[in-house]
Amino acid sequence: MTISDHPETEPKWWKEATIYQIYPASFKDSNNDGWGDLKGITSKLQYIKDLGVDAIWVCPFYDSPQQDMGYDISNYEKVWPTYGTNEDCFELIDKTHKLGMKFITDLVINHCSTEHEWFKESRSSKTNPKRDWFFWRPPKGYDAEGKPIPPNNWKSFFGGSAWTFDETTNEFYLRLFASRQVDLNWENEDCRRAIFESAVGFWLDHGVDGFRIDTAGLYSKRPGLPDSPIFDKTSKLQHPNWGSHNGPRIHEYHQELHRFMKNRVKDGREIMTVGEVAHGSDNALYTSAARYEVSEVFSFTHVEVGTSPFFRYNIVPFTLKQWKEAIASNFLFINGTDSWATTYIENHDQARSITRFADDSPKYRKISGKLLTLLECSLTGTLYVYQGQEIGQINFKEWPIEKYEDVDVKNNYEIIKKSFGKNSKEMKDFFKGIALLSRDHSRTPMPWTKDKPNAGFTGPDVKPWFLLNESFEQGINVEQESRDDDSVLNFWKRALQARKKYKELMIYGYDFQFIDLDSDQIFSFTKEYEDKTLFAALNFSGEEIEFSLPREGASLSFILGNYDDTDVSSRVLKPWEGRIYLVK
């Protein structure tokens, strides 16, 4: 029996790949202007290759006014000048391929910038041919002060109403995110065709191998854009998911997009897509090979554990059991199907995983970072690693609001200040929340060296666009970790080698079973491939603890662990210790 005899494990390059995510503003500055750029990425391709990575995913580098760090695109076919030129990007794609890696780019097509020519035309008059390319609605009415009332009660993902009033034609436009990130109307066929040609076709013609599809579940809104039912009784505005997520035509749109990609590529290369769908009720539909939608999806269930569904910065207590079940939900849906999964715990929208899910204290930062590496590398699905994760980066310490760059943080700070005051309990809770959960924790510049003040990200006399995390002074940087065999960086390299060596079990393994599900310290499980069984025993606590065998009398053959000085035959795990075994 071979891998391909299992429908859910038909071999594909993108299933077996480890994909390294790059946030261009913060990766490497090549020209000392304080911003990362495409030439900076090109200069570090060998470093990425040496990790054991098979593909890179580069976050948006397109022309943009940068209200939301490039996720507000004003021209899909042009590189933002601060990042370089189109020729710089073509060179990056070419050199990535020459090193044997694939190139994946971000596809941001739920919305565009209000500076895009499409929107400029649309807003010019109610009779413009592109008027219906966006969601325009008249006010629901006017309040006592004569201010226009938004068309419905949807809340923006970034706080406040999801509608912005435009005085040009005295109507509102829908924008589920920032005020100048206007939602495109996929119901309009001409709009869809323009999106496909400009945002997709142009880059396929220049050799990209795949797309991470941003906000992939939002393209089909609930018809008529009605008021949302009241889920959050503390607010007049309601989370927009009810009206905007997984709408009636969402799968039709993704099938249409898939057909466009397949027809556009003439050289036989297989294009992969990973859809950011947020929550997973439709994951098996999105990823079924027979349905021709997307290759795989990102779900948020496991990274949203410990947060409120109504406000992402409200910290909610959670148990290890809850986190285990959330993680498993990312891949259990593929059992017995032709679907596929992903495994990740960090990206540009999440805080650092060691701080959130392990122990970022000096005593356990390194060992618990390796524990998370073991967990992620042992899970079924395509593996994603975010820049800085491979060196065990942690959250920065608490900063005043002036130091934050994230538009989401800034918007919500102003809303809370206006509603409750700067010294309110709500504001104190907000600062606790952003200290743990802000997206900015993942967006600080990459520390390449130990050199002050800028850790090799940019020149020593340059002010970087964003403050560096001072952890580079405590050894969390590429230079020092490269020379330390015991570093998180070198452990990642060994773990990725093991993942390739045991790919049948680690990448394609099925029949996942928890061993100690109810334990709030031990994360242990088995999974199988043919007659082979993998067993993982991971201690998510600062105490020594005994783990249970997968079955009585089981014989274990050690594969990899995060402690060098441990008795791998012992059933007692040290604090934050993890081991991976073959079961005989």
UniProtKB/Swiss-Prot annotation:
<keyword id="KW-0462">Maltose metabolism</keyword>
<dbReference type="GO" id="GO:0005886">
    <property type="term" value="C:plasma membrane"/>
</dbReference>
<feature type="site" description="Transition state stabilizer">
    <location>
        <position position="349"/>
    </location>
</feature>
<dbReference type="InterPro" id="IPR017853">
    <property type="entry name" value="Glycoside_hydrolase_SF"/>
</dbReference>
<keyword id="KW-0378">Hydrolase</keyword>
<dbReference type="GO" id="GO:0005987">
    <property type="term" value="P:sucrose catabolic process"/>
</dbReference>
<feature type="active site" description="Nucleophile">
    <location>
        <position position="214"/>
    </location>
</feature>
<protein>
    <recommendedName>
        <fullName>Alpha-glucosidase MAL12</fullName>
        <ecNumber>3.2.1.20</ecNumber>
    </recommendedName>
</protein>
<dbReference type="GO" id="GO:0004558">
    <property type="term" value="F:alpha-1,4-glucosidase activity"/>
</dbReference>
<dbReference type="InterPro" id="IPR013780">
    <property type="entry name" value="Glyco_hydro_b"/>
</dbReference>
<keyword id="KW-0326">Glycosidase</keyword>
<dbReference type="InterPro" id="IPR045857">
    <property type="entry name" value="O16G_dom_2"/>
</dbReference>
<dbReference type="GO" id="GO:0033934">
    <property type="term" value="F:glucan 1,4-alpha-maltotriohydrolase activity"/>
</dbReference>
<dbReference type="GO" id="GO:0000025">
    <property type="term" value="P:maltose catabolic process"/>
</dbReference>
<comment type="similarity">
    <text>Belongs to the glycosyl hydrolase 13 family.</text>
</comment>
<dbReference type="InterPro" id="IPR006047">
    <property type="entry name" value="Glyco_hydro_13_cat_dom"/>
</dbReference>
<dbReference type="GO" id="GO:0004556">
    <property type="term" value="F:alpha-amylase activity"/>
</dbReference>
<feature type="active site" description="Proton donor">
    <location>
        <position position="276"/>
    </location>
</feature>
<dbReference type="GO" id="GO:0004574">
    <property type="term" value="F:oligo-1,6-glucosidase activity"/>
</dbReference>
<dbReference type="Pfam" id="PF00128">
    <property type="entry name" value="Alpha-amylase"/>
</dbReference>
<dbReference type="GO" id="GO:0004575">
    <property type="term" value="F:sucrose alpha-glucosidase activity"/>
</dbReference>
